[in-house]
Amino acid sequence: MSFNHFDDQGRAIMVDVSGKQPTLRTATAAATVSMQPDTLADLLAGRTTKGDVLGVARIAGIAAAKKTPELIPLSHPLAIHHAAIDFDTDQACGTVTVRATVRAFERTGVEMEAMTSAAVAALTIYDMCKGADKGITIGQIRLLFKEGGKSGTWQREEGQ
């Protein structure tokens, strides 16, 4: 196994992608936010003191995709062509699954943009609901799918 973010002397570098051809790159990532079922019921019914939690989280996630190189030092600045956030809720369990999809016509993948997008949307949900529920947790930030480029398509298997 090799890590390509290091040179021969072990120093951190940004990977040189200048020789690659741009291709359509897509990645989908997810993050899970767990809270009390009553907190989720209030969130979904619009009974929070901070407004439209999922609407704000959606905008935060989209903005985060565009800001990824400012947060992840060795990621490449990319021209993001599409960023979208979707939410799946399970009221009985009190969970919100954030799903972020990012697309770009680039020389390198958009996995980090999708993961950052999902994570920041989840953090925004936490921030906007923490006053009502101190026990909220964020977990399972994960890549679900990627395609484009030399490595082709990858999809997480169910339960993985």
From Swiss-Prot:
Keywords: Lyase, Molybdenum cofactor biosynthesis. InterPro entries: MoaC (IPR023045), MoaC_bact/euk (IPR047594), MoaC_sf (IPR036522), MoCo_biosynth_MoaA/MoaC (IPR050105), Mopterin_CF_biosynth-C_dom (IPR002820). This is Cyclic pyranopterin monophosphate synthase. Catalyzes the conversion of (8S)-3',8-cyclo-7,8-dihydroguanosine 5'-triphosphate to cyclic pyranopterin monophosphate (cPMP). Homohexamer; trimer of dimers. The active site is at 127. It comes from the Bacteria. Substrate binds at residues 74-76, 112-113. Its EC number is 4.6.1.17. NCBIfam families: moaC, PRK09364.1. It catalyses: (8S)-3',8-cyclo-7,8-dihydroguanosine 5'-triphosphate = cyclic pyranopterin phosphate + diphosphate. It is an enzyme of class 4 (lyase). Belongs to the MoaC family. GO terms for biological process: Mo-molybdopterin cofactor biosynthetic process. One of its GO terms (molecular function) is cyclic pyranopterin monophosphate synthase activity. Pathway: Cofactor biosynthesis; molybdopterin biosynthesis. It holds the Pfam family MoaC.
